[in-house]
């Protein structure tokens, strides 16, 4: 909004020339999101408490979690507001990639909100059925995949980190691949959101990493020099990534151990979907497996646990997702959280290093 209102004035007032720079708008989208979280956060927490939107803790989980009973959830509403508003304020709203990503963020957010509302406000422990959630997740992701498939100039090739000449053409398989990336990322973040700050920390780190890749992918010279796919318009997504980083850090202010509020499905589903969409739009889908390694391991631990118990009658872990396994082994919750953050930072550095390893 500000880009369209103020940048045209640059011809008369040189000060407004800064609005053409992605770096400027990305930084201020981040700052705006962070300040918005600080200002609105306490009010959101109070409203959630007034709605009795309190987390129900599993009795079969670690005993240390029982003290979390009654902590407000659905705090992802704050995250969504702190992403969407700064993005609308600082981004170029003529950019179709911005709207595609916001579609997933808001769409998955609404889906998560309905599920959370049924569980914690209407006291329906089942919420939405897994089939219902999967149907809507896949439908929204399919919409993105179909749109991109028919978007003139958008490549349906798969690019691999470390290999500059290996990029197989997916053709029509690009659509189910997009669905796999977006839905998979959404559910992986959802599974990771089991400890205070465990999911939002890596999400912010992932968003910061993709901010860099969005900027490079949208710059013809930089992308050519670093030999990554050039995606015209992708650079504008750096503004949205900046808002995600700011919103993540702002929410972490309240979600750090011991948490004052949980994000709920409204936050985890939308954030994961956003990361998946960013990966697709920048042609860095495989990179998400690296920088989002914590999410991948969390999801795989559940898949392996369920598969092993179903076919072998034995569990691999004491409890899945894997962060609960470490809890039951006696590792303190804050230590697990910080270690997972450290791992994510290392993986982010590895992902960034692929820019020069091709």
From Swiss-Prot:
<keyword id="KW-0812">Transmembrane</keyword>
<keyword id="KW-0133">Cell shape</keyword>
<dbReference type="InterPro" id="IPR003524">
    <property type="entry name" value="PNAcMuramoyl-5peptid_Trfase"/>
</dbReference>
<feature type="transmembrane region" description="Helical">
    <location>
        <begin position="73"/>
        <end position="93"/>
    </location>
</feature>
<keyword id="KW-0961">Cell wall biogenesis/degradation</keyword>
<keyword id="KW-0573">Peptidoglycan synthesis</keyword>
<dbReference type="InterPro" id="IPR000715">
    <property type="entry name" value="Glycosyl_transferase_4"/>
</dbReference>
<feature type="transmembrane region" description="Helical">
    <location>
        <begin position="233"/>
        <end position="253"/>
    </location>
</feature>
<dbReference type="GO" id="GO:0051301">
    <property type="term" value="P:cell division"/>
</dbReference>
<dbReference type="InterPro" id="IPR018480">
    <property type="entry name" value="PNAcMuramoyl-5peptid_Trfase_CS"/>
</dbReference>
<feature type="transmembrane region" description="Helical">
    <location>
        <begin position="24"/>
        <end position="44"/>
    </location>
</feature>
<dbReference type="Pfam" id="PF10555">
    <property type="entry name" value="MraY_sig1"/>
</dbReference>
<comment type="similarity">
    <text>Belongs to the glycosyltransferase 4 family. MraY subfamily.</text>
</comment>
<feature type="transmembrane region" description="Helical">
    <location>
        <begin position="95"/>
        <end position="115"/>
    </location>
</feature>
<keyword id="KW-0460">Magnesium</keyword>
<dbReference type="GO" id="GO:0005886">
    <property type="term" value="C:plasma membrane"/>
</dbReference>
<feature type="transmembrane region" description="Helical">
    <location>
        <begin position="134"/>
        <end position="154"/>
    </location>
</feature>
<feature type="transmembrane region" description="Helical">
    <location>
        <begin position="261"/>
        <end position="281"/>
    </location>
</feature>
<keyword id="KW-0808">Transferase</keyword>
<keyword id="KW-0131">Cell cycle</keyword>
<dbReference type="Pfam" id="PF00953">
    <property type="entry name" value="Glycos_transf_4"/>
</dbReference>
<dbReference type="GO" id="GO:0008360">
    <property type="term" value="P:regulation of cell shape"/>
</dbReference>
<protein>
    <recommendedName>
        <fullName>Phospho-N-acetylmuramoyl-pentapeptide-transferase</fullName>
        <ecNumber>2.7.8.13</ecNumber>
    </recommendedName>
</protein>
<dbReference type="GO" id="GO:0046872">
    <property type="term" value="F:metal ion binding"/>
</dbReference>
<dbReference type="GO" id="GO:0009252">
    <property type="term" value="P:peptidoglycan biosynthetic process"/>
</dbReference>
<keyword id="KW-0132">Cell division</keyword>
<keyword id="KW-0997">Cell inner membrane</keyword>
<feature type="transmembrane region" description="Helical">
    <location>
        <begin position="286"/>
        <end position="306"/>
    </location>
</feature>
<keyword id="KW-1133">Transmembrane helix</keyword>
<keyword id="KW-0472">Membrane</keyword>
<feature type="transmembrane region" description="Helical">
    <location>
        <begin position="335"/>
        <end position="355"/>
    </location>
</feature>
<keyword id="KW-0479">Metal-binding</keyword>
<keyword id="KW-1003">Cell membrane</keyword>
<dbReference type="GO" id="GO:0071555">
    <property type="term" value="P:cell wall organization"/>
</dbReference>
<dbReference type="GO" id="GO:0008963">
    <property type="term" value="F:phospho-N-acetylmuramoyl-pentapeptide-transferase activity"/>
</dbReference>
<feature type="transmembrane region" description="Helical">
    <location>
        <begin position="197"/>
        <end position="217"/>
    </location>
</feature>
<feature type="transmembrane region" description="Helical">
    <location>
        <begin position="169"/>
        <end position="189"/>
    </location>
</feature>
<dbReference type="GO" id="GO:0051992">
    <property type="term" value="F:UDP-N-acetylmuramoyl-L-alanyl-D-glutamyl-meso-2,6-diaminopimelyl-D-alanyl-D-alanine:undecaprenyl-phosphate transferase activity"/>
</dbReference>
<comment type="function">
    <text>Catalyzes the initial step of the lipid cycle reactions in the biosynthesis of the cell wall peptidoglycan: transfers peptidoglycan precursor phospho-MurNAc-pentapeptide from UDP-MurNAc-pentapeptide onto the lipid carrier undecaprenyl phosphate, yielding undecaprenyl-pyrophosphoryl-MurNAc-pentapeptide, known as lipid I.</text>
</comment>
<comment type="pathway">
    <text>Cell wall biogenesis; peptidoglycan biosynthesis.</text>
</comment>
């Amino acid at each position: 909004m500000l880009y369209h209102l103020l940048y045209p004035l640059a011809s008369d007032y040189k000060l407004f020339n800064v609005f053409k720079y992605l770096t400027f708008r990305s930084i201020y989208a981040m700052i705006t999101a962070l300040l918005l979280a600080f200002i609105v956060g306490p009010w959101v927490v109070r409203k959630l408490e007034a709605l009795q939107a309190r987390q129900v803790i599993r009795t079969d989980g670690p005993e240390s979690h029982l003290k979390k009973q009654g902590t407000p959830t659905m705090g992802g509403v704050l995250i969504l507001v702190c992403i969407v508003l700064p993005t609308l304020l600082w981004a170029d709203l003529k950019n179709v990639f911005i709207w595609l990503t916001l579609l997933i963020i808001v769409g998955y957010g609404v889906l998560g909100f309905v599920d959370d509302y049924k569980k914690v406000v209407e006291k329906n422990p089942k919420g939405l059925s897994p089939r219902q959630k999967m149907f809507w997740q896949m439908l929204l992701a399919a919409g993105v995949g179909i749109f991109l498939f028919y978007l003139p100039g958008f490549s349906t090739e798969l690019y691999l980190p470390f290999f500059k000449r290996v990029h197989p053409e997916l053709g029509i398989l690009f659509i189910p691949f997009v669905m796999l990336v977006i839905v998979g990322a959404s559910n992986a973040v959802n599974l990771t959101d089991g400890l205070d700050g465990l999911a939002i920390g890596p999400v912010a780190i992932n968003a910061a990493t993709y901010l860099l890749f969005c900027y490079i992918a949208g710059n013809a010279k930089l992308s050519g020099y670093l030999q990554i796919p050039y995606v015209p318009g992708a650079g504008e997504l750096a503004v949205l990534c900046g808002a995600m980083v700011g919103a993540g850090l702002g929410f972490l202010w309240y979600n750090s151990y011991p948490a004052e509020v949980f994000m709920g499905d409204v936050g985890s589903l939308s954030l994961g979907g956003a990361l998946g969409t960013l990966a697709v739009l920048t042609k860095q889908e495989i990179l998400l497996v690296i920088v989002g390694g914590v999410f991948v391991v969390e999801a795989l631990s559940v898949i392996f646990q369920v598969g092993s118990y179903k076919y072998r009658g034995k569990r691999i872990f004491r409890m899945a997702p894997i962060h609960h396994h470490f809890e039951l082994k006696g590792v303190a919750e804050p230590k697990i959280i910080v270690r997972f953050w450290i791992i994510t930072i290392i993986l982010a550095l590895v992902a960034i290093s692929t820019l020069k390893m091709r």
